[in-house]
């Protein structure tokens, strides 16, 4: 079996201390990394932000800026029609428990803080690169199109500049909101107050005009965190309370997708070529199920993702038909999009590519059924319209209801691991006949 194409590049020119390594395309990684403005010099302003605003900025000052015509459209929220990106700026997309994600031109860049106190060696936290690349290299058919492979991964880089950018932006917003609301400026910010006022003003032209004026001065970076800034507040404030680690970590570069799977909704499914939102969820379920079936045809130990949900399935354009063969069954997808599995942070292939993070997430051996149990629960939650389709509801309930299994918070405690033949039988049923080409489904 083939192992991932890994091109290691020990880079000490990026850091004064600590070894760094680049996996994958070093040229594209360096392009991204070198476009982060002043990463080694980003620091809190010499003059404290609250003091500058207290001494020099009044409500009348802000009012004059608001009445001015100048506005930088890159500070609107990304979903706003008025948003317009500047070349080679980084725009915050989202932040979760295990990564801060930005968009930069045709790339998605994910920063992951790795806590050295957890005793992980740098190469033990590379599953987001190694596992999808391993699977892609060993799968031989169109099922490879259902996997997102990282372009490159930088390991053990110093990324604490993100925390400084956060604090600068938080201090800026705190000062602006206090003046706008007629409240006294304070040396210490209240993140709860900033969250409340950010929700109030983020769509406002006046707010964007003020950010256009002050963000370049206070933050002085091409990393724009204004979009979904509330996610960053939740991440850094929660992590600060738990003594979070914000020094070194990994930088992972992915191709830019159209969107994540949950962004296709009852309001827009027709734009993607579907007759209903339920048909789309069947399409998503079938493509991911076929990927798992083809993975389990490989002569390797159990693959488990451990976080299978629409958030971690990305949508890409599909410019030609996709053909998948399982036994005597032929599946054909002619839709203009395809679903691709992403975010392999907790994934593992037992004994071949183990993952210490997976060990902390589950306490016993699991397989594909664990993922689809959780996936089915989430589909019901995200798409309640499924309940109107009795056949699809019944099918998904086969993963969520069983007297022999104990379901706790969508997580499955399994006494016996079901065979992949169970899933093969599921995808051969008439409910998926739209995508089955010329084969009998009478063995339902």
Swiss-Prot record:
Pfam families: Pox_ser-thr_kin. One of its GO terms (cellular component) is host cell endoplasmic reticulum. Its EC number is 2.7.11.1. Residues 87-444 form the Protein kinase domain. InterPro entries: Kinase-like_dom_sf, Poxvirus_ser/thr_kinase, Prot_kinase_dom, Ser/Thr_kinase_AS. Coiled coil: none annotated. Its main location: host cell. The keyword Isomerase does not apply. Phosphorylated in vivo. Autophosphorylated in vitro. Belongs to the protein kinase superfamily. Ser/Thr protein kinase family. Poxviruses subfamily. This is Serine/threonine-protein kinase 2.
